[in-house]
Amino acid sequence: MRTPIRFPPTPLLLAALCLTASAAAQASDHLICKDATTPEGATQVGALQPLFRDCPRITDIDFTGRADGHKFYSGVYTGPPKDRSFYEQADDGVLMQRGGVLATVKTSSFPGRFPLLSGARPFYIEAQVATSSNHRDNFPAIWLMPIEHNARMEDVYEGDPKSFERWFELDIDEGGFGPGGHHTAISWSGIWPHYKKIQNPNPTSKVPLDRTQPNVFGVSYSPDTLTVRWWLNGRPVLEATQPHVPEIARRQNFYLIVSAQSHKNISHYQMKLLGVRAFVGDATTASGGATVPARRAKGSP
């Protein structure tokens, strides 16, 4: 019988063990990925149809960025995917080292297994995450981007000037900006690199948040009123509407990104994704026009 090799407890390993133990103690019976009820944020906007609900596993991640049929991809279109060394499996989720990314579409900006969130329909989406420390350098992020904003520039619309892009970015939460959550709705437009940015004011909560505990960050969206509302652990915390939520949002289709970023690369930390779930409602007629069709999922080379 081989004698097992014992490794010394490195700071990164200790952080991972503490994060795993904390989550197990606090959230083992409250994982959103095992909760079949409809959250209040979904009910408020009429997003009553479950779209997906998932407890992430390492086997769900594609590390090439291009394989069909995966739930998560380890990168986005702006750069190469992260390799397997950035990720670990925990009992209750996937751990990412600083620099890790999980996105629900391929790096080629084509859909994966999870459906996109159509801006023509009300929706609610939430993610349950925890970090290994509350260091201010940590920049854990949960956000939505339209799949149309890609290298093919599919966010250039008929009637606009050549290469003039328009898209809506919805940041469900970002860490390191203050003691509490940081929630932004951003209307982007223009020709690269001279983009115009319109963002909601006062996005940062002054209420301290312990990010080492499993927190549930959610956002609801209504295409009728072009209003978004952010939710923290089941309670509404902030709201935004036009001009920060632009009309172009109704024509776009959104995917989820969860990323363990850093403000100045000072702190080494891990971010755990424990679960995600999304709900949608019926398509609506935008501003008296025709119902905006949802983008169909399709494969890619």
What is the role of each PLM region?
Residues 213-229:
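Localized edge beta-strand/strand-to-loop motifs within extracellular or lumenal beta-rich domains
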Residues 153-216:
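Glycine-aromatic-enriched beta-strand/loop faces of beta-sandwich-type recognition domains
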Residues 11-21:
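Bacterial N-terminal signal peptides
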Residues 235-253:
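Short, solvent-exposed beta-strand-to-loop segments that form ligand-recognition rims
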Residues 229, 264-273:
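Extracellular carbohydrate recognition
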